[in-house]
Amino acid sequence: MLIVLAKAQVGEGAMEPAMAAIKAMVAASNAEEGCIAYAFTQDLLQPGVIHIVEKWKDEAALASHFATPHMAAFGAAIGGLDFKVIEAVKYHADEGSPVM
């Protein structure tokens, strides 16, 4: 299993149009075969910061995700916005277990 943790900075005035693109991206990505979880969330303490959490079955599922039409549509939608990924890191993990 792969876990991707990413962070993006959205400029002032770009959050509303970015959120429309993000909602479509989350819905389409969660429907992909091999996607276990896919979520964006706004940081509560840092204005304009969005955290992205993804869980994929394997490398093939993640690679397939980057080739989807909705990934291309998302790139086009945010292309004109002040939206930049600050970091994105992929982790290899086992199935995990409850923390509590």
Task: List where the protein language model places each region.
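N-terminal first-folded block
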Residues: 2-39
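Short, well-ordered beta-strand segments in beta-rich or mixed alpha/beta enzyme
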Residues: 2-9, 39-66
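Short flexible/disordered coil segments
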Residues: 3, 7, 69, 94-100
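Generic "edge-of-domain/loop-turn" microfeature
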Residues: 13-15, 45, 61, 95-96
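Localized chelating/binding microdomains
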Residues: 23, 52, 100
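An amphipathic, aromatic/His-enriched active-site/gating alpha helix that lines ligand/cofactor pockets
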Residues: 24-36, 55-89
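Glycine-rich beta-strand-turn "strand-cap" elements at beta-sheet edges
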Residues: 41-46, 76-100
